[in-house]
Regions:
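Flexible, small-/acidic-enriched active-site or ligand-binding loops
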Residues: 45-76
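Solvent-exposed alpha-helices and their adjacent loops that cap or buttress functional pockets
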Residues: 12-17, 30-34, 59-64, 84, ...
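A short core secondary-structure module
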Residues: 4-52
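Active-site beta-strand/loop segments that form the cofactor-binding cradle
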Residues: 2, 6-8, 12-15, 27, ...
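Cytochrome P450 core scaffold surrounding the K-helix E-X-X-R motif
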Residues: 51, 81-86
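Alpha-helical interface subdomain recognition
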Residues: 1, 69-74, 85-90, 94-242
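Short, solvent-exposed loop/turn segments at the edges of secondary structure
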Residues: 16-18, 35, 65-67, 208, ...
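Short, solvent-exposed coil/turn linker segments
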Residues: 32, 43, 77-78, 132, ...
């Protein structure tokens, strides 16, 4: 195989322990859409593979893990380096993305719980105008709504996991897409409330909240942006009435 092209945001390629890439390439542009791509193993470092630069995410390079911009210039690898066979790249990706998305959402629930904990501790420990912050400005509602929304999303994640176990990843895609939209957005909302409760401290390096927020905001793009998942959900719903 001879590989040419480039890609941005190749996560993990900056880590010195990264010695092999699973590279998604077009091997048959004339095939049906889901059979055009293949996955090929490319060692690192390797002739023709140029790591151009680390891509920044919200101003940080995320070293040493990194999200790299990489170019491939006539990269020649043995034909045996293909995974499963020609045209099966999309199939492989789809098999990974469902479990990957639900894993992201499970971790996001944990992030939301941590943010709510920090919010509550701050609300009880900080006073203003002779009262704790919890008693001011409708903050009871903020705390209550955060708990409600976290638990709603947790149940949605559990349902998606159940559907994956019972009907399979492909058939459960509506439920997977639903949590991929709902959970990061919910978590961002809880983190934002926690930041607001902390004031300037919330965006400083002295709490994890700023890093939590950037991670969850990035997750709305990783493994498919919200808009793509909403399209999946809507199309699956409409199928019931066509």
């Amino acid at each position: 195989w001879v590989i040419n092209g480039e890609k941005h945001y190749i996560s993990g390629a900056g880590d010195p322990r990264c010695k092999i890439m699973i590279t998604m390439v077009v091997t048959n542009p004339d095939a049906p859409k889901h059979l055009r791509q293949s996955q090929i193993l490319v060692p690192l470092p390797y002739p023709g593979v140029e790591v151009v630069r680390p891509m920044y995410v919200f101003g940080k390079d995320d070293a040493p893990h990194g999200h790299m911009h990489i170019k491939f210039d006539n990269v020649r690898v043995p034909k045996e380096n293909i995974i499963l066979g020609e045209g099966r790249g999309f199939e492989i990706s789809q098999g990974r993305l469902g479990p990957g998305r639900i894993h992201h959402c499970m971790r996001s629930i944990g992030v939301a719980e941590r943010a709510l904990e920090l919010l509550c501790r701050r609300a009880l420990s900080r006073t203003a105008f002779g009262k704790s912050l919890a008693e001011l400005g409708g903050n009871y509602d903020v705390i209550a709504n955060s708990r409600i929304e976290i638990d709603m999303c947790r149940l949605a994640v559990l349902k998606a996991a159940y559907m994956m176990d019972t009907i399979g990843n492909k058939e459960a895609r509506k439920y997977i897409s639903a949590i991929k939209v709902a959970v990061p957005n919910m978590t961002l909302k809880v983190i934002d409330s926690a930041i607001q409760m902390h004031g300037a401290l919330g965006v400083s390096q002295d709490t994890p909240l700023a890093a939590m927020w950037t991670g969850q905001r990035t997750l709305r793009l990783a493994d498919g942006p919200d808009e793509v998942h909403r399209r999946v959900i809507a199309r699956e719903e409409l199928k019931q009435y066509q």
